[in-house]
């Protein structure tokens, strides 16, 4: 066995760098935190090659004494703690004294700093862990650190880095977290010479809007609870703002971004009664407590912490959020009994009453009931302000009566005649439907038509297709269909999802891509750094899925083309979900193995949505598609698309024959 020997300092620093500096974002975090601890009021960051080629951070802080500038690059050298008692009460962002030494061991680092009482700045360089002699330099008061060619001397670690776009996204996200925690400091970011953002010193309210977004700010509730010893403040999103991603969840403890299970569990418990399924809340929480009440020396990255009294922290977070959410429970609108009151509170609209059996004239509203002369808006369940909104269980309102001139009446009748003109296809569809519904009932057709035999194209009762024919739509969600000896209930969204999914798979297999169509007017939307990075890395892959997107700059993307098959879908939501899938999948080599998952996400957007009213031909067309689609018994998520109630089961429900 070889003899035991002490490792050289350079190798020790490189080993430590494996924990402290996993990627450029970690190096950026260590450097910016030093600027914050130095009392800087402005921090400027420049990145090249996603932070791999260059990270430059300049600040206007107190600077480093000329005699200490070499020591700043030595391992375990710091000005922030001196005793064990200091470690137990640490209030600074950094304290371990190994960040700069670790970065210097895996990059070409240049440190330039000047204090206010110095006539000139002092500069020192480090390459492969070797320090140069300090030299005089020109520099304003403050410090600038340049870390170039990260991991140039550790190729094994460098090859594990992602693309420049992905690494940049991590750096930008890291800087945004630091900016969010310190709104009193001005931050700026340049990428490859181009300004990305420039945030002045501002209030927390303004900083949240700038980082998290105006949409979050509009849909958020401000919270502030606790006392001088333990305080929780910030903003939490209303349940209606909940998303399927966790990219808008920020926890700060003493202005340090952390991932803490205690706080996250308390938040989840507070939202438990108002959020369901895979939706996650958005929030920006700041917890302030004495430094001795929290241990930040758990991991070199300092994102994991331990509370001395985790129960107290959990109760504060839970009760504060639970109280704030008490009046915004999403399930209030789910109850028919109080839906009218909720609609009135939200929109100022009073729902229309159900017509009574003894008040038949109420089925038609006269123009006097609507002074504006407009029809009630039935585009959604709530309607528009000042108009009557039909309840989900209420039939569509009949057209209003208006007095028309003879010429207007004739024009209107001509229009309606053309609108309701039947085609041969619809006649055949309705004939099949009537045959399936009523069988061979006595005909009420005039006598001179009773001798005409049925067309050979109309199936008899015994020739009904497997899923029968549609007879009605239920609650805007389900299709009722009559088969030979049963009643079928079909989840129209789940069924259409499976049909679209299989069609897209077949089109990809046959053509190699999905057929797309250009939008007349491109649709733009604000994107996250991760979404922009996914577009930059996978633009060709997106084109294969029928999506054409372009980067407009300023974290704004434009959708220029969408799949023909999904022409009626929300293209922004579709683009976001596909970009999210690509970002999660990662490299192009693994996208092929996850192609079906991406297609499943896309098919969901192109499927019939709940609440959409279908005609009988549309419903029957879906049934026929189901019959010709493989695996149409389940949707893409494993849920059944239809259930069957036989005549015997229906008889049992009504106690017939017992």
UniProtKB/Swiss-Prot annotation:
PROSITE patterns with a match to the protein in the record: DNA_MISMATCH_REPAIR_1
Keyword set includes DNA damage: yes
Region (Disordered): 114-138, 353-405
GO molecular function: ATP binding; ATP hydrolysis activity; ATP-dependent DNA damage sensor activity; mismatched DNA binding
SMART domains in the record: DNA_mis_repair, MutL_C
GO cellular component: mismatch repair complex
Keyword Hydrolase: no
One example of a Gene Ontology biological process annotation: mismatch repair
Pfam family, one: DNA_mis_repair
Coiled-coil regions listed in the entry: none
UniProt entry keywords in alphabetical sequence: DNA damage, DNA repair
Compositionally biased residues, Basic and acidic residues: 114-130
Biased composition (Polar residues): 361-372
InterPro entries the UniProt entry points to: DNA_mismatch_repair_CS, DNA_mismatch_repair_MutL, DNA_mismatch_S5_2-like, HATPase_C_sf, MutL/Mlh/PMS, MutL/Mlh/Pms-like, MutL_C, MutL_C_dimsub
Cysteines paired by S-S bonds: none
Family listed: Belongs to the DNA mismatch repair MutL/HexB family.
Function: This protein is involved in the repair of mismatches in DNA. It is required for dam-dependent methyl-directed DNA mismatch repair. May act as a 'molecular matchmaker', a protein that promotes the formation of a stable complex between two or more DNA-binding proteins in an ATP-dependent manner without itself being part of a final effector complex.
Name of the protein: DNA mismatch repair protein MutL
